[in-house]
């Protein structure tokens, strides 16, 4: 009887351990896959600083182009496409966190005017869904539904990202008006050079923290190097740690200066930002414009007919 109880207890503990392991794996995997948006969301309340700079540029130091395309004008309560293009050479390979080379990923943030937001799934047309692919967008904050983030996602498949946007209706949202509004966008390709805590990633150049002679270069077991620099003038030595990824530019016995690059810069990516404008158009204005154009066309037609009638009368009087 006691053996049976012991077996049941062991079985219960094993089941619980397996369940906990699975939960840890799922949580860890989710946090890694969503690393790009979470970095900005956890550190910055607003992704756009007062200077107009998007905060992603604090970690992605290289400047690269990005482009956004939206309609010139949209009607209220309408779904439209905001297309963000993040161009780069598809043949390039970036340094991964483990020091190996791999394909670049991309990410984007789009800052819409207040009232504009991600279109609900039931409002998105099949054509737009096909262009979107399997992308899953997030709100930057639960209370900032006009700021959307995406990434990291495979760059070879999603260098062009289609955001489905729903325009607001001033009839139901009193703080929205029929005006011209700015839209801001930021897009990166590849990993950053600095983490939000200020530490360097392995996707950047490493400089000497002291002047002197390189007395020893030791390769670490898991990759990377320990470079020992001896400063003869001060009689001290400094050890610079190089993570796996960057290639060494110095050798033992070499004399180096302070801040001299010890490695190459492996970064092949970068961040770019841009902006555009969109008009929330009043349907009554459109109807009024159409009515005006129609009246002008009718006036022209009547003028031509009147002129022809006058010419006929003149011709008749001359013949008479």
Curated annotation (Swiss-Prot):
InterPro entries: Cyt-f_TM, Cyt_f, Cyt_f_lg_dom, Cyt_f_lg_dom_sf, Rudment_hybrid_motif. This is Cytochrome f. Disulfide bonds: none annotated. It is a single-pass membrane protein. The 4 large subunits of the cytochrome b6-f complex are cytochrome b6, subunit IV (17 kDa polypeptide, petD), cytochrome f and the Rieske protein, while the 4 small subunits are PetG, PetL, PetM and PetN. The complex functions as a dimer. It is found in: Plastid, Chloroplast thylakoid membrane. Heme binds at residues 36, 56, 59-60. The keyword NADP does not apply. Component of the cytochrome b6-f complex, which mediates electron transfer between photosystem II (PSII) and photosystem I (PSI), cyclic electron flow around PSI, and state transitions. GO terms for molecular function: electron transfer activity; heme binding; iron ion binding. The chain crosses the membrane at residues 286-306. Its cofactor is heme.
